[in-house]
């Protein structure tokens, strides 16, 4: 007796324990290039001296080498949309001068090899006699991001101390006989390496509007520069700090001084020392310095505000204790209050950098969402994006691109929390602004803009469990279809074949789209899908590619009509399969995993089988033939590839036979025996069982010396109970 090929294999419950969701993490290679604080300072001194020799009258500018960064640099082009004063060629290093004669601080990349993260400190460029005192640079922004291993629903959370693997996965299931669907969550935030960029003289730091490189205006730190514009009697320069013999205890005492310049000296010293010495953070904490710095955020003097914000940013970096203490001292509320009322770009950079650092700790997320989200959205995100709904109450003041970058980095972390995700979806104008910014960048061919990555990761996170958490038109159609099916099936013992709800493919039309989507409606709109695919086809940034694929993966991960509709929209209407297939050729295993998981979700829908067979099947089978299996994502990649091949093979056995090779079959057999990749081994066993049951493909197995007894040995009684019952 000839047995027909298995169209479905194994019941729903067989997949209950499968681990199929994935997490987004930076590549291991990029995380291994850590440098010590001493090495960074030496590099900064060398670069400063080199520029001093060539341009003695120009202020020195910090330059940090780009060590394997996933960014090409921090010089990003911005078109003039949204706000007329936005820079069209933005440099990380803004021009600035110390109004008291001593150097201000520069944002400097700090790479932590052990904790798998990129982030930035605020560092003093010139401190002590060994540094040339010729330049003053403005404070940079910071981020403090990493990952947590054990987190509900396989979402990566930004905890500071974690297992390098940093993943936990929990599958949600598709229909009977199909691979479990895969929800993705990407939250991790990164900062890139930094390069010095020239500026034209006389251009305000946050208002540059030329695309050509511009030069930093020459500045000099003289001993008689005033403390602030209104306090000419208070003067200080770097020599005063240099000769003061400051220590951490004395700097903390300075914070309580009635003299504002002493307050600033103490804060700047703490900021600088915490960049160099991790132990200084604990010392400041023990001396009660955090409380005093929080109090200084209320100072009427902007220089003191900036110094205090920069010191707090460095203090909380990589220190959960200091983060919690900052919250306990009401630091979050004070920082948000200052951000709401300040008009200083440099203070905004420091504050948004501080909030970004704080957002990496779970315990602070709820308060940050309640306190910081409204200010970040209304004062930074919405104004900078250019989106407008006619609400004149929102701020339309110029926003610096770096402030926007920091704000989106903070939201990138906050969107990983359940309460944050729901609040952001419901916040008027937020999703619209993020989508508008991404679309504008794609239209302007700025797909590798550093803020695009943050925006895409926020949109990726907001699409997580969208079908279950947000009332969509798909859910209403499903509800109507189920009711209609129930009514018809209750009238008799037989029902029309067209009324059956098989494999979640319901006989009902797809919902009509809103011509002008708003809020969460954007997340599943065809314009958003088109934007993701265009970005996927143009961007060279791995993290951006992964976020695009992850957002689409979330949209196709449900068990209902939305998954089918989104899959058909991606594969048929928008013709996005070639872009997804390109991801499988990436040298970054995170990107490959995202693409393979997305294809696995889409392969559950028979309407796509033919087009997937011609456009992606060869690439997927190549994964099973040539994938080395030596990356942390290999198990996920191979499991997804097995499920995709299995689903397509059931509809297209003849085409599958053309692409199956002896080496691929051998790899699948070897994968079944793998004890280190249980999920991939289970997927390979199911694929083998379907191959054996197919008359077109059984011969390939026999040519490799494979027989039915070997299949039973490899698969085991539990995983092949449905298969063996057919013989």
Curated annotation (Swiss-Prot):
Main localization is: nucleus
Q: What top-level branch of life does the organism fall under?
A: Eukaryota
Cellular component per GO, a single term = adherens junction
Alphabetical list of Pfam families matching this protein: Arm
The protein's UniProt keywords, in alphabetical order, are: Cell adhesion, Cell junction, Cell membrane, Cytoplasm, DNA-binding, Membrane, Nucleus, Phosphoprotein, Repeat, RNA-binding
**Quick one: where's region Phosphorylation in this region is required for cytoplasmic localization and protein stabilization?**
54-69, 117-192
Concerning PROSITE patterns, the annotation shows: ARM_REPEAT (PS50176)
First and last residues of every ARM repeat: 244-275, 276-317, 318-360, 361-412, 413-443, 505-536, 537-583, 584-629, 630-693
Among Gene3D superfamilies, the record links this protein to: Leucine-rich Repeat Variant
Question: What GO MF annotations does this protein's record show?
Answer: cadherin binding; DNA binding; RNA binding
PTM annotation? Phosphorylated by AKT2; required for interaction with YWHAG and subsequent localization away from desmosomes to the cytoplasm. Phosphorylation of Ser-119 by AKT2 promotes PKP1-driven cap-dependent mRNA translation and decreases intercellular adhesion, phosphorylation is promoted by insulin. Phosphorylation by RIPK4 at the N-terminus is required for its role in differentiation of keratinocytes and DSG1 localization at cell junctions.
What is the protein name stated in its UniProt record? Plakophilin-1
Source organism of this protein record: Bos taurus
